[in-house]
Amino acid sequence: MSLLTEVETPIRSEWECRCNDSSDPLVAAASIIGILHLILWILDRLFFKCIYRRFKYGLKRGPSTEGVPESMREEYRQKQQNAVDVDDGHFVNIVLE
């Protein structure tokens, strides 16, 4: 005897959606929130580099460089970059015995 004959299979009417009362405001609100969440998640995944770069660097404006010679601007940029660069000497190698 096959295992399939031993298992109860739901009849077709049990598979259908039982929420025929879709005029319920809670169901409508949940649907709208779900769709908005999906749209925002997709946009976040598509543009996350632009969005987070804007938050990280765009909101923290540095000092104004108006009237400052280009050589001093370049020196300032270099200092800022050196402060950001990771120094490999800070890492500790642990050897387990």
Curated annotation (Swiss-Prot):
Domain of life: Viruses
Record localization: Virion membrane; Host apical cell membrane
Intravirion compartment spans: 44-97
Activity regulation remarks: The M2 protein from most influenza A strains is inhibited by amantadine and rimantadine, resulting in viral uncoating incapacity. Emergence of amantadine-resistant variants is usually rapid.
rRNA processing keyword on record: no
Virion surface side stretches: 1-22
GO biological process: protein complex oligomerization; symbiont genome entry into host cell via pore formation in plasma membrane; symbiont-mediated suppression of host autophagy
Site (Essential for channel activity, possibly by being protonated during channel activation, and by forming the channel gate and the selective filter): H37
Main localization category: virion
Stretch forming the signal peptide: none
S-palmitoyl cysteine lipid sites: C50
Single annotated GO MF: proton transmembrane transporter activity
UniProt key word S-adenosyl-L-methionine: no
Membrane protein topology class: Single-pass type III membrane protein
Glycan attachment sites: N20
Site (Seems to be involved in pH gating): W41
Keyword tags: Disulfide bond, Glycoprotein, Host cell membrane, Host membrane, Host-virus interaction, Hydrogen ion transport, Inhibition of host autophagy by virus, Ion channel, Ion transport, Lipoprotein, Membrane, Palmitate, Phosphoprotein, Signal-anchor, Transmembrane, Transmembrane helix, Transport, Viral ion channel, Virion
Sites bearing Phosphoserine, chain numbering: S64
Family the UniProt entry places it in: Belongs to the influenza viruses matrix protein M2 family.
Domain notes: Cytoplasmic tail plays an important role in virion assembly and morphogenesis.
Extra remark: When the channel is activated, one or more imidazole moieties of His-37 probably become bi-protonated.
Assembly behavior: Homotetramer; composed of two disulfide-linked dimers held together by non-covalent interactions. May interact with matrix protein 1.
UniProt protein name: Matrix protein 2
Organism per entry: Influenza A virus (strain A/Swine/Wisconsin/1/1967 H1N1)
Top-level taxonomy: Viruses, Riboviria, Orthornavirae, Negarnaviricota, Polyploviricotina
Gene: M
